[in-house]
Regions:
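N-terminal secretory signal peptides that target proteins for export/translocation
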Residues: 1-7
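N-terminal presequence-like segments and the immediate start of the first folded domain
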Residues: 8-89, 93-109, 115-172
């Protein structure tokens, strides 16, 4: 039984392998390859060739928008969309200080806390509204590989978004 499953898996991978490569399109061996469906705002995989400098950005949380709001409420940081924009702007600044940009992001991990206004469910749509302003756009078409997960909480009450990224930059 296990041999049959392994044989089927191998056949499937061999059959789908060329399709995945075709989606990535031709790329020079020394260029980053972003693989995935063209209509998707995220890459299924990103291949970074040897020789690139990697920048690892720790989990970044949103800035306080309203210091007069009651402590521990989302109004301290805004809704999920607002928090996502604030976090990505912070990441953008960190990357720019290192000579990189959001176009260099190859991997992203998004942690979302459930929104009390949504019955404790993560606001994936709100996060995507913020995300789509920066990635897979006409001005910045590069898409990172990404994971989005709901977590129980972050470091401060009212925070609903934390994002960690890895960026790859070709040395001069």
């Amino acid at each position: 039984m296990r041999r049959t499953i392994r044989a089927l898996m191998l056949a499937l991978m061999l059959a789908l392998g060329p399709a995945v490569v075709l989606v990535a399109g031709p790329a020079a061996a020394d260029e980053i390859q972003r693989i995935g469906a063209p209509a998707s705002p995220i890459a299924s995989a990103v291949i970074v060739p040897a020789g690139y400098d990697m920048i690892y950005v720790s989990g970044i949380t949103p800035p306080v928008l309203n210091p007069d709001a009651p402590a521990g409420t989302p109004r301290d940081f805004g809704d999920t969309k607002t928090q996502t924009i604030g976090v990505i702007e912070r990441i953008k600044g960190i990357l720019e200080a290192q000579g990189a940009s959001l176009a260099d992001v190859v991997m992203m991990r998004v942690l979302l806390v459930g929104d009390p206004a949504k019955g404790g469910q993560m606001d994936f749509a709100g996060m995507m509204e913020g995300y789509r302003q920066y990635f897979a756009t006409e001005a910045q078409p590069n898409k990172p590989a990404r994971i989005t997960s709901q977590v129980a909480g972050l470091v401060a009450p009212g925070m609903m978004v934390e994002i960690e990224v890895q960026a790859a930059v070709k040395p001069d």
